[in-house]
Amino acid sequence: MKITRLAILMTLTFSVLKSQATEFNASLLDSGNLSNVDLTAFSREGYVAPGNYILDIWLNDQPVREQYPVRVVPVAGLDAAVICVTTDMVAMLGLKDKIIHGLKPVTGIPDGQCLELRSADSQVRYSAENQRLTFIIPQAWMRYQDPDWVPPSRWSDGVTAGLLDYSLMASRYMPQQGETSDSYSLYGTAGFNLGAWRLRSDYQYSRFDSGRGASQSDFYLPQTYLFRALPALRSKLTLGQTYLSSAIFDSFRFAGLTLASDERMLPPSLQGYAPKISGIANSNAQVTVSQNGRILYQTRVSPGPFELPDLSQNISGNLDVSVRESDGSVRTWQVNTASVPFMARQGQVRYKVAAGRPLYGGTHNNSTVSPDFLLGEATWGAFNNTSLYGGLIASTGDYQSAALGIGQNMGLLGALSADVTRSDARLPHGQKQSGYSYRINYAKTFDKTGSTLAFVGYRFSDRHFLSMPEYLQRRATDGGDAWHEKQSYTVTYSQSVPVLNMSAALSISRLNYWNAQSNNNYMLSLNKVFSLGDLQGLSASVSFARNQYTGGGSQNQVYATISIPWGDSRQVSYSVQKDNRGGLQQTVNYSDFHNPDTTWNISAGHNRYDTGSNSSFSGSVQSRLPWGQAAADATLQPGQYRSLGLSWYGSVTATAHGAAFSQSMAGNEPRMMIDTGDVAGVPVNGNSGVTNRFGVGVVSAGSSYRRSDISVDVAALPEDVDVSSSVISQVLTEGAVGYRKIDASQGEQVLGHIRLADGASPPFGAMVVSGTTGRTAGMVGDDGLAYLTGLSKEDHRTLNVSWDGRVQCRLSLPEILTISQGPLLLPCK
């Protein structure tokens, strides 16, 4: 393939297009017939023929835009052509305003629409091999110089699309005595994209069949809204029924609009906080995180400690966590999500404005209630290390609230913020009530000791303070005595000791009320990795958890485990769990992780309670497929019950280019549709996605407003499939569905020497084109050597070889082709 690579290199040209004609020295080619070389297209240095091209745009060493239309236009009075750099191209580059205003039109182009960007410091390069246009621009010209930051001019809103994300769970409980019961849960998001606008509707469905012919079902839409990015304002506009997400005020459901700064449009260094939720499951259990009845996250976990992934930064307030065990028992508690101090850069302002009417009466009630309200909040970087923030809720009714705070970066001492909020409310029957709420946040990372401490969201509210949700609740109960929050705080601490291969984590959360018992949660975990003789990579951990519930009662749990590697990506573990209710569980577990796409485990244990003891057996399997993720688990306690759980997570996306099922997507993060024509089985991003029978596949496009590199897994391509490009780079806005057509061919491949009727070879650079489809199958190299791909049965008799601008002969291929045969003799007549 050396000659083929040489032929490709010969096609490289540059966009400094005004040059003298050059005749190539054909003697440099290792060819037996030097006169038999057709290089007329390359006779002028840097030559690119005038016309319209579809090229990938690059800036320095970074991709900017893919498959962008580019014009190459002739210059009047000169035997030359130039690449037309338009104002739209310049806008994509993120140049400083003074540089843009200084650009002049290219002389000799009549319409004046082509700008001269070439100078002693900048270049415009064209690569025919890669179909790429590269701008070499000095950093001093650039408005943005953060290597992890892509300016808004390079963001894409994607294509018009419909989507449906879903999470389906089903479980069956079969007691030894009593009726079998089934439960089902389905939740997700449906949406539609048009330009920069996104329509979204969250949905939830649940059903419980008791086994006695009775069933309960429920379906509702917690929020339906329309949103779009406003890059010029670094903001997001939302319209419809949604939840207020505020760093200052408590969250509540309302119908209206919100205009807010979006941190994700800022550099990565300015990112907020998202809570971690942890606990201990007694069996194969279903964990649900919700807020005001809306499911935020739901999954099934194995017995033992669990930690859920970070939730969205846009979530604020208290979260409800419930664990439903395989025997049907349920435990619930609350987690506070107050954010750590956020420091704005000096002179920077971040804001949020919301207006509308509250929705109250549960997630099923989409009727608004008074009063109409207007909310505003802002953070201002007053000084280098000091930020001021505040907010106001003004209503046409009987509720007003105002807050004022300060955030301070104390350097080595960490970051601290403090604020005070006042509320004024007139309750039913004319009772007026005013009160104050005080809050302190603190966070500190100790780099030298590997420690992180966050004293997150300590808040104290006096007896007369009412948040907006509490006020709405009082109105709904005609001034009745609803739960009235008094104090809440969350403390998290983590410690890493690399020398000892140990780590520790502590989490404390407390929420109490003026008129109810407190809700407290404590979690401590210790982990160590060690060796024992010839056994390497052993690990041991111990966890302590205590939950005190608002309705009374508490549960203490201790969990300890030791894991021993068992071959490659397999392990055996022993665990023991004890609680304050007399329960003691001992379990031996075997886990298999050698296939990253399908993992499974089985376990056997003995359970002892105050009322007796029993044995238990359980197992689970999780499989990640290109079109979704599946999981199943089963539990057996002889003489007690059997249970079975199933789950399926996935998405379906449809555009004018096709539709495809895919793995579950995260919230409103963007996704990318890959189109390979009719070529199926093309793997993308490992096993994240594979094109379906129609040549369409969908994969996650990473994070909004961040460049995502999506690659075709060339090593895993089917033997008869070839692709022209394997990496896709694009920056998509929130919720966007990107689209990229990949030139893929499916068919036979052959390597051979093409011979004419007189025994000679076609000239170097001649093209082999399918007479059936018009697709280029390959290019002729030295001595007639050609590598032809994507050949169909019809191509065996319809491949044309062209040079000098016309078809010269037609190839005749053997009936059976295989690349392993080596170079074949390919007659051309």
Q: Locations of the language-model features?
A:
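Membrane-embedded beta-strand positions of outer-membrane beta-barrel proteins
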Residues: 164-168, 201, 237-239, 351-355, ...
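Transmembrane beta-strands of outer-membrane beta-barrel pores
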Residues: 141, 170-174, 196, 205-209, ...
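Short, ordered, surface-exposed loop/turn motifs in non-cytosolic proteins
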Residues: 49-72, 678-688, 758-772
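Post-signal-peptide, soluble extracytosolic/periplasmic N-terminal scaffold domains
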Residues: 2, 6-12, 19-271, 580-653, ...
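Short Pro-Gly-centered beta-turn/loop motif in secreted/extracellular proteins
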Residues: 76-85, 311-316, 696-722, 733-734, ...
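Short, acidic Ser/Thr/Gly-rich low-complexity loop/linker segments typical of extracellular
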Residues: 688-696, 773-785
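Feature captures outer-membrane beta-barrel proteins of Gram-negative bacteria and organelles
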Residues: 155-157, 184-195, 218-231, 370-384, ...
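A short, amphipathic beta-strand motif
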Residues: 57, 277-279, 672-676, 748-756
